[in-house]
């Protein structure tokens, strides 16, 4: 994924931090549309999303979270934050029967963490920043992250996997936090 890192560097001079929407903002439930053409606008979006994700700090960000309703995700689960991956029009083409439980958090739900069960391995097909199709087998944290971010593209937030009681408590907490800001 050196291409994404290269593009990130190339656009660094013009990058902007984007505002991250917070749950329960209704715009987080909007389904993202496919990207028609991978062009400089999309590459700039990837760079801006990466800058925003690193600054937050986070390990993944979907365009939906920054109020851009197109199928674009950036992820970097590396310890050194030097393995940026961009996924344009991602789709899961295979998932294992095995499950894993990870404690998830989200930049759109700051301060909230809870366990979510997901397939432990997935294969993703997407476009890179040059508009070329690639496939990637994911496991562990990368598999969790790609599924979490793809949920955002479908208008779903991880807390919606939790019980109705937990969801209600989180909504109340987030609304109080928003009023305090």
UniProtKB/Swiss-Prot annotation:
- Which cofactors, by name? Fe(2+)
Does this entry carry the keyword Hydrolase?
yes
What detail does the entry give on cofactor binding?
Answer: Binds 1 Fe(2+) ion.
Q: Which residues bind Fe cation?
A: 106, 148, 152
Which reaction equations make up its catalytic activity?
Answer: N-terminal N-formyl-L-methionyl-[peptide] + H2O = N-terminal L-methionyl-[peptide] + formate
Show the disulfide pairing: none
Q: Which UniProt keywords apply?
A: Hydrolase, Iron, Metal-binding, Protein biosynthesis
Q: What is its EC number?
A: 3.5.1.88
| Cross-referenced InterPro entries | Peptide_deformylase, Peptide_deformylase_sf
| A GO molecular function held by the record | metal ion binding
- The active site consists of 149
Q: What does this protein do?
A: Removes the formyl group from the N-terminal Met of newly synthesized proteins. Requires at least a dipeptide for an efficient rate of reaction. N-terminal L-methionine is a prerequisite for activity but the enzyme has broad specificity at other positions.
Give the family per the record.
Belongs to the polypeptide deformylase family.
Reproduce the miscellaneous comment text: The submitted crystal structure binds Zn(+) rather than Fe(2+).
Protein name from the UniProt record: Peptide deformylase 1
Give the species.
Burkholderia multivorans (strain ATCC 17616 / 249)
